[in-house]
């Protein structure tokens, strides 16, 4: 009898969707995750004499190991020697200790009940390696002692969240933009196309813009007080007196938080290929930085996201063979079997936080309509709400784990004990 014991809703399966930018976790069957906190975590390594700073809200790692500061409130407090690190690289787990710290934190602070009571469905990158999948399976069963486990590709979950089992998922997150063809609930590996032009790339472009405009980036943690100043006038603010010696990685993280707010508030994708004249006619957007400096942004707000669609005019991209967003989609479809292409063009599903830049989907729709073969019907599926687009793979996981028909799919503890960690390759496509 394979895992038939678990009925979806009664057990309260947990769904984890851990991305490069945020961690989303919650109970299956609910419509949005219970928690959503940054994947970046603060890490303080003990000093040589074995003393650490006062522990208040840190999660102690292994004995004598580093102390981790997780979730926004703990991470954004300036501390001496605290590095901001990310457990993921290229969408896959790289640093297992800090990854485990994130899971510990979620269980302790948010689930607040024994890990052994809840089956876990976890999302994974479509290019995750066999070794990492097996290691994760082993961690969940051996360390957390969970009753059942399942790993599912993010793209498949996004398709399910949109009520489809076939479609082309265009996922643009923090570290990369990918087009992933899904057919009948399976990822077609040969059709995956990845581009590094995504949210972090836009953050870098914004940083360069601020340098050109001589705008000083001051994260809020440095500011004691500020005065209102007129538009374009130099900022008038006072620095906090007693600031600890922070690390460069952490200061950088705090600066990026400011830039990401700017990205979400100001940037917009131009309707058609960027044109100086047209951009100059667009309405400007007023933005105030944390230190009180404020000004209007005009053409710049269209110019920065242009790199996503037309990488050719971005300076500093070497040899520039990168693909714009719409090229990523058409290239991916072109690598799939000719018979399934209509099904892919017929549901291009847009997901990921980076696609929330204003007018992103309009521009994508426009470019794809020009590139789609006349014999095929193009349909772009993009949720209007930020929640559904940012959490799409979590929502798909929530739907999947609470389906009655899914309950026989879990890898049960018993199966794991009999077949070892290799069973993940067999049971989770």
UniProtKB/Swiss-Prot annotation:
<dbReference type="GO" id="GO:0006310">
    <property type="term" value="P:DNA recombination"/>
</dbReference>
<dbReference type="InterPro" id="IPR043129">
    <property type="entry name" value="ATPase_NBD"/>
</dbReference>
<protein>
    <recommendedName>
        <fullName>Actin-like protein 6A</fullName>
    </recommendedName>
</protein>
<keyword id="KW-0234">DNA repair</keyword>
<feature type="modified residue" description="Phosphoserine">
    <location>
        <position position="86"/>
    </location>
</feature>
<keyword id="KW-1017">Isopeptide bond</keyword>
<dbReference type="GO" id="GO:0006281">
    <property type="term" value="P:DNA repair"/>
</dbReference>
<keyword id="KW-0156">Chromatin regulator</keyword>
<feature type="modified residue" description="Phosphoserine">
    <location>
        <position position="233"/>
    </location>
</feature>
<keyword id="KW-0804">Transcription</keyword>
<dbReference type="InterPro" id="IPR004000">
    <property type="entry name" value="Actin"/>
</dbReference>
<keyword id="KW-0010">Activator</keyword>
<keyword id="KW-0227">DNA damage</keyword>
<comment type="subunit">
    <text>Component of numerous complexes with chromatin remodeling and histone acetyltransferase activity. Component of the NuA4 histone acetyltransferase complex which contains the catalytic subunit KAT5/TIP60 and the subunits EP400, TRRAP/PAF400, BRD8/SMAP, EPC1, DMAP1/DNMAP1, RUVBL1/TIP49, RUVBL2, ING3, actin, ACTL6A/BAF53A, MORF4L1/MRG15, MORF4L2/MRGX, MRGBP, YEATS4/GAS41, VPS72/YL1 and MEAF6. The NuA4 complex interacts with MYC and the adenovirus E1A protein.</text>
</comment>
<comment type="function">
    <text>Involved in transcriptional activation and repression of select genes by chromatin remodeling (alteration of DNA-nucleosome topology). Component of SWI/SNF chromatin remodeling complexes that carry out key enzymatic activities, changing chromatin structure by altering DNA-histone contacts within a nucleosome in an ATP-dependent manner. Required for maximal ATPase activity of SMARCA4/BRG1/BAF190A and for association of the SMARCA4/BRG1/BAF190A containing remodeling complex BAF with chromatin/nuclear matrix.</text>
</comment>
<keyword id="KW-0539">Nucleus</keyword>
<keyword id="KW-0832">Ubl conjugation</keyword>
<feature type="cross-link" description="Glycyl lysine isopeptide (Lys-Gly) (interchain with G-Cter in SUMO2)">
    <location>
        <position position="62"/>
    </location>
</feature>
<dbReference type="Pfam" id="PF00022">
    <property type="entry name" value="Actin"/>
</dbReference>
<dbReference type="GO" id="GO:0006325">
    <property type="term" value="P:chromatin organization"/>
</dbReference>
<keyword id="KW-0233">DNA recombination</keyword>
<keyword id="KW-0341">Growth regulation</keyword>
<keyword id="KW-0805">Transcription regulation</keyword>
<dbReference type="GO" id="GO:0007399">
    <property type="term" value="P:nervous system development"/>
</dbReference>
<dbReference type="GO" id="GO:0035267">
    <property type="term" value="C:NuA4 histone acetyltransferase complex"/>
</dbReference>
<comment type="similarity">
    <text>Belongs to the actin family.</text>
</comment>
<keyword id="KW-0597">Phosphoprotein</keyword>
<dbReference type="GO" id="GO:0071564">
    <property type="term" value="C:npBAF complex"/>
</dbReference>
<keyword id="KW-0007">Acetylation</keyword>
<feature type="modified residue" description="N-acetylserine">
    <location>
        <position position="2"/>
    </location>
</feature>
<dbReference type="InterPro" id="IPR004001">
    <property type="entry name" value="Actin_CS"/>
</dbReference>
<keyword id="KW-0524">Neurogenesis</keyword>
